[in-house]
């Protein structure tokens, strides 16, 4: 009701009523109507309410969703909105105690099971969406929850699009960011594997062309096969490197060895 009244007041103020004089709040409201507008709805039904009031006053909102839109995905499609989708999933129900388990509803258990499929439902329905760290108990959960969403059907290509092109397009700044093209800001990551592989690490982060080292690629942690030439013949070892100063060699005997590293050259001792 308050939002609707503000829209009506702003429309009235456009007529420049003499009795009102200068109203900086309504003037600013009218001046900013051309900007992208985000409505934090956080629920499937609130999404539809936000869209209805937007339709009433000619505004296409960008809607910040919740985690239950998969339950009414056709209605979400009908809004023609771009959504901002969080990756915050409900915690598992505590059913260890049979007395507590009696009060856990089937709806809650189904939502716990299906919430990670929310983003995949948007992709399947052809609804444009971005991904956000909003609502997470810790931003450190983002990659774990993102990988879980991919296990539930969200494609790698759509993830990249939802983190880059779609946000930039939605905010009207795709001419500056959102892809690696000549003339755009050089904002990108370099990893030692697939960005979505839990074992991969971010090595460099480029921000507007400036390089920031996250993990130096000179660190050679890993497992290696080594052949040593000796007068009695070749000896084969497996090297397990876990730190920058020590290595374990496995062969006929297990040896704890120290090593030093100079760039790409390693010396064992």
What are these regions (language model features)?
Residues 16-28, 90, 94, 214-223:
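Long, charged amphipathic helices and adjacent flexible linkers at domain junctions
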Residues 36, 82-191:
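His/Asp/Glu-enriched, well-ordered alpha-helical/loop segment
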Residues 40-43, 64-67, 134, 227-230:
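Structural motif
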Residues 68-79:
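Active-site-adjacent beta->alpha loops and helix N-cap segments on the catalytic face
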Residues 185-217:
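C-terminal cap of metal-dependent C-N hydrolases
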Residues 217-238, 245-253, 259:
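Tryptophan-anchored aromatic micro-motifs
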């Amino acid at each position: 009701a308050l939002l609707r009244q503000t829209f009506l007041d702003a429309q009235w103020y456009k007529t420049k009523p003499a009795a009102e004089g200068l109203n900086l709040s309504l003037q600013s409201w009218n001046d900013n109507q051309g900007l992208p507008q985000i409505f934090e709805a956080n629920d499937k039904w609130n999404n539809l309410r936000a869209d209805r009031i937007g339709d009433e006053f000619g505004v296409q909102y960008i809607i910040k969703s919740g985690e239950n839109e998969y339950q009414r995905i056709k209605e979400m499609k009908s809004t023609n909105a771009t959504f901002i989708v969080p990756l915050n999933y409900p915690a598992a129900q505590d059913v260890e105690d049979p007395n507590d388990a009696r009060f856990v509803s089937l709806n809650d258990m189904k939502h716990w099971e299906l919430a990670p499929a929310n983003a995949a439902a948007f992709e399947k329905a052809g609804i444009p969406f971005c991904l956000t760290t909003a609502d997470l108990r810790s931003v450190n959960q983002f990659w774990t929850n993102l990988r879980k969403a991919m296990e539930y059907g969200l494609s790698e290509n759509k993830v990249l699009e939802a983190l880059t092109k779609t946000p930039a397009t939605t905010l009207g700044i795709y001419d500056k960011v959102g892809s690696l093209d000549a003339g755009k800001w050089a904002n990108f990551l370099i990893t030692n594997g697939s960005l979505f592989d839990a074992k991969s690490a971010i090595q460099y982060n480029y921000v507007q062309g400036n390089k920031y080292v996250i993990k130096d690629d000179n660190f050679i942690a890993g497992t290696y096969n080594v052949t040593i030439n000796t007068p009695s013949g070749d000896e084969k070892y497996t090297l397990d490197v876990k730190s920058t100063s020590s290595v374990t060699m496995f062969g006929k005997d297990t040896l704890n060895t120290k090593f030093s590293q100079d760039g790409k050259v390693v010396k064992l001792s």
